[in-house]
A protein has these predicted regions:
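Glycine-rich loop(s) and the adjacent beta-strand/alpha-helix scaffold that form part
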Residues: 195-249, 395-408
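N-terminal Rossmann-like FAD-binding beta1-loop-alpha1 element of flavoenzymes
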Residues: 10-34
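Core beta-strand elements of the Rossmann-like FAD/NAD(P) dinucleotide-binding domain
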Residues: 6-8, 186-195, 373-374
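Conserved redox-cofactor binding core of oxidoreductases
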Residues: 99-187, 192, 199, 240-247, ...
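Glycine-rich active-site loop/strand segments that organize a redox cofactor
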Residues: 54-87
Length: 476
């Protein structure tokens, strides 16, 4: 196991939407490296289906103040309202910027970017559902990821693919770089850097049934927590109402935005009882609680009464084919159901972390409850908590979040690097991590030590005690 040293001005950890957008902003102004444990286009941003909200008003009257109102209300009024205003105000230019970079948005007949309804988004502060979500069929995240990655490639951004960052170097309260493990060789790589942005995504794999990929293990928050940085809003975890039964694979809100209906075992459109005005397009927390309530009251479907149905059969084959192609392919592949003819079994699935690394609106990491800035360290996207989502995120605001605050993280890196001088880390900067890895490898031979068992026990405990309704303390 070798220790290899690199020197950069800035490092971005993670190559999903937030990391790539930060790289686009920072790369022209510094020597920059993007370190990712996956190939960039395999990042989880690509799994996002439904859309990215912005008050473009292409279909009907809209403005960013209404978007902001909905976001704050949907958060149970626990979001940071100045940050929400920034998110919603900058959304419009962010969508236009992506369009100019080549993102193939779906279009209206007049050529403008198409927009559709999404849960919790309304016009005139709750009067009716809003057509606000800009989309590319039902593969919006995939298109955003591809567009941002191609922009990075065209700019000559340096990538270190399949490197897992395991540690950050902070000396005297100042960032000095990161240490990573090269997955292919087992070598340790030390990256000197004055500025580091964590854009490592969420941590949904703490749950057994999750929409998250296996790679979403909370790397960024975990690394900083071990350095004494307190995490924010960790109790707020979103459960998406419509995951494929038992699998957790997400069926986007786009399906309900196009007219899909949730039904219980009796075929009743039960959301009419829980949200009479917006029904199936209520915010995700409300819909997930409604489904959980239906199941607990014996109205769930199936032999165990533990799921409900998402009914698309009334939409027609042409609408399903044109607007929901990926969603319906998932259903055909994984549950062998033809959604044109049969309703789909769904259940709430662990989906999105509202909490994470505390930051200000410029993506600067805060090291304590007083808002003290940790010099040179930034975070954006799901790994960060700014907090624009409060206790519940509205659908389509996550893709918006990564672009708006990814850009701000890149700008902050540029400002910081331009005002500081280069330095050198000690020659043995990676030795402590090397020793930890060797000790871990030796421990693997202990029959009483099993990483898979620890993970399974964690997932079982979270699944039982920390889902939609939490009635007891967790004991691990």
């Amino acid at each position: 196991m070798k220790v290899i040293k690199h020197s950069f001005d800035g490092v971005i950890v993670g190559a999903g939407g937030a990391g790539l957008r930060a790289a686009i902003e920072a790369a022209p102004h510094m020597k920059l490296a993007v370190i990712t444990k996956l190939y960039p286009t395999r990042s989880h941003t690509g799994a996002a289906q439904g859309g990215m909200s912005a008050a473009l008003a292409n279909v009907e009257e809209d403005n960013w103040n209404w978007h902001s109102f909905d976001t704050v209300k949907g958060s149970d009024y626990l979001a940071d309202q100045p940050a929400v205003d920034i998110l919603c105000k900058e959304a419009i230019d962010s969508v236009v910027e992506l369009e100019h970079w080549g993102l193939p948005f779906s279009r209206l007949e007049n050529g403008k970017i198409a927009q559709r309804r999404f849960g919790g988004h309304t016009v005139k502060e709750g009067e009716a559902p809003a057509f606000r979500a800009c989309y590319a069929a039902d593969r919006t995240g995939h298109m955003i990821l591809q567009t941002l990655y191609q922009k990075c490639v065209s700019m000559g951004v340096t990538f270190f693919d399949e490197f897992q960052v395991l540690d950050i170097k902070i000396d005297d309260g100042v960032c000095k770089g990161v240490v990573a493990y090269e997955i292919a060789t087992g070598d340790i790589h030390v990256f000197e850097a004055r500025a580091v942005t964590f854009a490592t995504g969420g941590f949904g794999k703490i749950y057994k049934v999750s929409s998250n990929a296996h790679s979403l293990t909370g790397d960024g928050p975990g690394i900083l927590y071990q350095k004494g940085i307190p995490l924010e809003d960790m109790e707020f975890y979103q459960f998406h109402p419509t995951g494929i039964y038992r699998l957790g694979i997400l069926l986007s809100e786009a399906a309900r935005g196009e007219g899909g209906i949730l039904r219980n075992k009796d075929g009743e459109r039960f959301m009419e009882r829980y949200a009479p005005s917006i029904k199936d397009l209520a915010p995700r927390d409300m819909v997930s609680r409604a489904i959980a309530t239906e199941i607990s009251e014996g109205n769930g479907a199936g032999p165990n009464n533990d799921f409900v149905y998402l009914d698309l059969t009334h939409l027609g084959a042409e609408t399903i084919k044109q607007k929901l192609p990926d969603i319906t392919d998932f259903v055909r592949t994984y549950v062998k159901i033809e959604p044109i003819d049969e309703p789909i079994p769904v259940q709430p699935t662990a989906h999105y972390a509202m909490g994470g690394i505390p930051t200000d609106v410029d993506a600067r990491v805060l090291s304590d409850a007083n808002g003290t800035i940790l010099p040179g360290v930034y975070s954006a996207g799901e790994s960060a908590c700014v907090s624009v989502h409060g206790a519940n995120r509205l659908g389509t605001n996550s893709l918006l979040d990564i672009v708006v605050f990814g850009k701000r993280a890149g700008q902050s890196m540029v400002d910081y690097v331009s005002s500081t001088k280069p330095f050198s880390l000690s020659e043995n900067a990676g030795e402590d991590l090397k020793n930890k890895i060797n000790n871990f490898i030796e421990k693997e031979h202990d029959p009483n030590f099993s990483v898979p068992k620890i993970r399974e026990e964690l997932q079982d405990s979270m699944e039982e005690n920390a889902k939609i309704f939490r009635l007891s303390l967790i004991h691990i």
